[in-house]
Amino acid sequence: MKLSDIADNAGSRKKRMRIGRGIGSGKGKTGGRGGKGQTARSGVRINGFEGGQMPLHRRLPKRGFNNIFRVEFAEINLDRLQDAIDAGSIDANTTINAESLVKSGVVRRAKGGVRLLGRGEIKAKLTVEVHGASKSAIAAVEKAGGTVKILAPKKDEGEAA
């Protein structure tokens, strides 16, 4: 047996159907698109159009609003913080704040500040300065002998002081 003798199994590679190549091909004339009209033409269908029936986005009620002044915190759990300390990304002896978390790569961006959450355990004695923290996170850090300082909300750079 030679490499040139090896062939694919019968039916493992199916030839693609070439549409619109005569009525004998089985996909000629209209090419599987049915008759005439909008759906037979090329181009985009009308999104959300349900054939005259009241579309779903109009049947459902409007709810809520988007608060343009909403502050979004970068959230970090205790287990993630402990992993970063174990890996050596963060020094437990220094003050841990938003800048140090971004610099170490633990948090990607902290535009509105950082919020500490209580999932997991913390073993190291830490000094943490964050813009928000859950009660369980504060309790866990203080149990390990550390302190949590809650900072005032961050002001936007463009906002007048």
From Swiss-Prot:
- Gene3D superfamilies reported in the protein's UniProt record: 3.100.10.10
UniProt keyword RNA-binding present = yes
Q: Keyword annotations for this protein?
A: Ribonucleoprotein, Ribosomal protein, RNA-binding, rRNA-binding
Any single GO molecular-function term of the entry would be: structural constituent of ribosome
Q: List the residue ranges of the region (Disordered).
A: 1-50
Domain of life here?
Answer: Bacteria
In terms of PANTHER family, this protein maps to: 50S RIBOSOMAL PROTEIN L15, LARGE RIBOSOMAL SUBUNIT PROTEIN UL15M
Q: What does this protein do?
A: Binds to the 23S rRNA.
Looking up NCBIfam families in the UniProt record yields: rplO_bact (TIGR01071)
Q: What is this protein called?
A: Large ribosomal subunit protein uL15
Organism whose genome encodes this protein: Nitrobacter winogradskyi (strain ATCC 25391 / DSM 10237 / CIP 104748 / NCIMB 11846 / Nb-255)
Q: Which gene encodes it?
A: rplO
